């Protein structure tokens, strides 16, 4: 079984993906980390605006070296949004994601284009969202908890900028797949959101 979870930044899709993967005993890939890793590489090289450098970084990326905690900074979130808008970067990471999804038994993937581009035939598709304000509150708490000194207003502006860039890009824009189920987590806590997501997946498994 392949479960595809898409949605904007800080919508809760990653948390739900990890919990669903643990529940079903499936491997999980946060595809956003791939773009954050590419962003980290070109930032370190001083080449964030160099498309060729970002494509090369994506082409040679080793998933085994990813450090999720180190990649979850506000700066790398912004860098990820920049490099993810480049068709060459997305193409370079496509095969890696396809191979992950094709594992025996299935997988859970979350990102921006899983249900539309990476796994269009996934058995269960969710589009997880929440209001920009709620998402900014969540991301702000996360960043403060990690020791980053950042204002809520800055995080909200960043969320809105990333939403616009993700939705407007030419390469695999953020859109809800026609057969994805919308899950708005604005008023839900983690337990409620997981219960709703699990119900959606179980309904799809039962053919409903």
From Swiss-Prot:
GO BP: pyrimidine nucleotide metabolic process
A GO MF label: dCMP kinase activity
A GO cellular-component term linked to this record: cytoplasm
UniProt cross-references to SUPFAM superfamilies, sorted A to Z: P-loop containing nucleoside triphosphate hydrolases (SSF52540)
Binding site for ATP: 7-15
EC code(s) of this entry: 2.7.4.25
Enzyme type, top EC level: transferase
Alphabetic keyword roster: ATP-binding, Cytoplasm, Kinase, Nucleotide-binding, Transferase
InterPro entries for this protein: Cytidylate_kin, Cytidylate_kinase_dom, P-loop_NTPase
CDD domains: CMPK
Primary localization: cytoplasm
Family annotation (Pfam families): Cytidylate_kin
Catalytic activity: CMP + ATP = CDP + ADP; dCMP + ATP = dCDP + ADP
Family to which this protein belongs: Belongs to the cytidylate kinase family. Type 1 subfamily.
Entry protein name: Cytidylate kinase
